Every structure is written in C-alpha cells, then in structure tokens.
Amino acid sequence: MTGEMVNYYKQIVLLSGLEYMNDYNFRALKSLLNHDLKLTKNMQDDYDRIKIADLMEEKFPEDAGLSKLIEVCEDIPELAARVDILRKEMEKVKNKTKIKSESSPLPLTSSLMEAWEVEPAMVTASSEESKDTIPESPDTMTTQFLEEKPKFPLLSATSTSQAEGEPLTPQRFPTTASSSLQTPLEPTEILSTILATSQGSSAPYSTCDKSSRVPPVTVSSSLQTIQTCQATSTLPCSHHTSLESPKTEPSSVQATQMTQAIKASGHNCPQVPASAVSSSFIKPQVTPAMLLSGVQTPLMPQATVPSRAQTFQLTPAKMTSGCNSPQMSAATVYSSYSNPQVTPVHSSVQILQMNLAAMTIGCNSPHVSAATVSSPYNNPWVTPATFPRNAQTLQLYPAAMAHACNSPQVSAATISSSYNNTPQVSSVTVPRSFPAMSLSPAKPLKAKIGSHLGATDQLVKDHQFEDNEMQNPQSGLGTGLSDQPRLSRTQSRTEKRRRKQEEQPLATKMKRLSLSPPQTTARRVNPMPTWGQLKKLTREAEGLVQRTGNKLSSETMFLAMLALIAMQSSSEICNYDKGGHSGTSSEK
C-alpha cells in the first residue's frame, strides 16, 4: 500500500476516532491495546492521542491501525456510534483507490516504444509514392476524389447502433455525431495488431492495405497510429473542406458540415496518404435528414414566416376593461361610474353575439344594455340615433340565465361599466319568467285598530303628513318623482296603491276608528269594544284633540267631538262616570 493511502487512514484514526474520545475512553483504549502496541506503564501514562496514532501507524502499516481501532471500539458501548462513522470513512478511501487504479495510464512496453520509432526509410518511400499519386492542382484532385466510389461497405443499422460508443470514422453517418465529440479510447488489442503489422511489413503501403481490410471501427485507430509518422506528402485540411458542395446542401447544413476528423476533440486532421484512402474518408456524406436535432440549425427563410407571427396585433375588441368584465370593444366601454355615455359603435362590433350561458360573471349587480337602462340612481345619456340598425340585433337569451347572478346579463357590447353596484333594470330586458318581488298590500286600518290599541298615534302621523303636504306642496312625493325616470309596472302599481291609501279623507278614517267594528281573520271579536278599550280610546281621542289644536280642520274637530259624544252616550261609560271619572269627559 502506498504512503498516500496510509496517510488517509491515519487521518481517519486521529481526526475521526481518537479526537472524539473522552479521557476515560482513551485510557480504556490504551489499556486494551497494551499487548498489540507493547505499551509500558510509563507509555500508557505519558502518550497522548497523537503519539498513539503514530505508534499505531508503525505497528499496523497496512491501514494505520484503523481496522484495529474499529475492532476495539465495538467492545465499548459509548463508542458504538463512532464505529459506523469510521467504517464509512474507510469505504470512501477504498473507493478512491479503485478509481485511481482504473484511471491510471497503461505503462509503455518495449514493443510500443519500438512502434513509435518507425524507420525513416519506410516513411520516405511512402511519402515519395504518395507524391507521385496525388495530383498537383486542387481542381483535378477534387474531381478525382468525387469520382471515386467508397471501397468500404455502408454500415447497417445494427452495426451503427453497436458502434455508437466507439470513435467515429469519416465514413460513419452523422447520426452518431455525439460520440465523435468524446475523446476516443483505443483498445489495446487493436493498437498492438496494427503496430505489429506496420513493423513486419516490408512494402511501404502494407499498413494502409491492412487498415483497408479492417472494420470501420478499427480504421480510426489505425489512422491515429499512422498520424504519428512524419509523412511529408499528405492532404492538408483545406483540401478536405474544399470537397463540400454548397450548391446541393442547404445553408443550415453547411454551418454544421465539418470533416469528422476535425470534429474529434483534441485531435488534428488525420494525415493519410491519398493512395490508400478512398473518397469516403475525406468527403463525409452528410444528409440533412440524418443530422441530430441538436445539431440542426435551420435558417427559416423570411417568406415562410407568417406576418401575424412576427407582430402580435391586438385589436381593440379583445381588450378587457376590468377584472370580471367580459371582452368587448374599447369604443363602447367607459370607466365612469355614474354617467355612462354611449358613442357610435363600429361595424366590426356587430359580430359580437354572446349568449348568456357563456357569461358567468360572479357579480351580484346585473349588467344590462346601456341603451335601455332607466334607473333612479344613474342618469345614462344615450343617443339612440348613433346606433346602426343592425347593431341592435344582438342575440339575447334570457332563459339561459346563470344561477350565480341575481339578474339576467345581456350582451357585452353595450355594457356601460362593470363596477356599478346599483341594480339597473329596465322593462325591456326583464323577461316574464324573472321572479318579481311579491309586495303584499298593507293591512287594513280596521285590523290594525282591532289588534293594536295604539293605532291612533299612526293616524296622527298621517294627519301631520297631510297637513305638511298641504302647506308645502313643493315637497310632496308627486313632484319628487317628476325628476326621475319612469318606474316599472310593478313599482308603479305599488306607488299608486300607496298614494290611494294616503289620499283617503280623514272622515273615512275617523268613521272606521269610532263606528266600524274591527275585522280579523285570526279570531272572532265582539261588535262592541270592551270597557278597557273604550277607556284607552277615549284618552287617546282627548289627547289627539289637545295635541293637534288648531292644526286640524273644522270637519276633523267636528268628527272627533261626535266620536266622544257617541262614546259618552253608552251605558257602560255612564256607569264608569258614576265612579268619579265623568267630570273630565263632560267638560271636554
């Protein structure tokens, strides 16, 4: 074992083993290694961890005592975890040694040394012979090599797949160009056979003849062997590249066409006598179909690229105005919140036909057409004359309303804004199947008086409201509605019913209060009120007269007095007056 490996093992023993032990475990280790290290009493007391490591390296030169340390630590319970660490470190060192031994170069033998030193006579003879055979002009040489046919058979699919890991020869197709970028590793047997052939042959072209008979995988190694010879008559690299014809191959392939000898990493162009090498070694036959996808860099002509792919033309019709608003024309979308203004729509917007089933916007506010919106909250300014006739034929499908919305959504071409939270409903866009709010009419005043004894206060409020309306006619409800757009049918009916109830004469209300019996559906009530009801009703009537005073009309005062007289004329009230309360009523 080399000294470097022993040094690695010693580092593990000292740094990963002895340094992690406490004093007690270290003294126990010295005691257990007493016979192996031949420690005396003084040595056990004086030697520290470094001296023990040096002594273990001396006594166990194989691994610096690492295996012995692991064996001893297994017997100590406190160092059981340290044993696994030491074994892992030991395996790492062993793996390093294996890798280094495999990657170490082969030593040069005497036969190899003799092969590198080729006799100069053979080189001279071969160079002279090659000078006679090579034409002097580059044009004639190019035509000659192009006319020659390859002497080697083409590789089949199986041989090509098997030889992908081997060095690439110029005859090989570019399908295995990835392996040609790697440094070729020549097998030892092929080198020895070729070198032995070059030594034993007497003819100057024996080596080239032998190389022509071997498979294409061994030809590359033979060419690299012949490359070391100092041949004077060889083909320069410029002649190799001049054989490529740019007329028959596209520009993308010309950029990737290189001779395979030049592509080899760390190797020069193979210099071989031209008489022994056929044209297939010099002119690599490259076809665009066989190039790798990573190697091909096709230059697409400008005419083949469509114009729409070069510039992305964004039409205004595809621009969105908000987060949840559908795609619509920019000419019809405004971000104003209260007063949307609709401008003329171009004819290209007429093709926007969107059904309601495709529009599922998670908004609670209905989106209706700006041309038909009439809401008490917004005042849209619409110019119907600017819309063309065919632009108003947008397809609307109210039956396909989305369940996530509370109201139908119509075409996006005329949406004023998607940010308005106020519901905008018109009589044109609301279908018959749309669920209208069922407004139950107000309870009759008789039932209120019969069930609630304090209904007189509500009556007083109604009187005050009518008096204020008579005094201030400009603040009424009728004038207030004149400034607003007309309501829908349901709202108009409700408003008319409410006005009719408010416009009832006060005499009718007083008659219902004093003379008509209460009518309820829950239970049957006696036609005459009880004593307690009459008592409270009398007090409320007296308070009504006192609070209103001169504000009430003469007719109202007269009816109130008639009601009090009618209540005082009953027998029960007379009995009640005998109890001491008749004085106040008579005075009134």
UniProtKB/Swiss-Prot annotation:
SMART domains: PYRIN (SM01289). Signal peptide: none annotated. This is Interferon-activable protein 208. Residues 157-183, 469-526 are annotated as: Disordered. Residues 5-92 form the Pyrin domain. Residues 172-183, 470-487 have a biased composition (Polar residues). Belongs to the HIN-200 family. GO terms for biological process: activation of innate immune response; cellular response to interferon-beta.
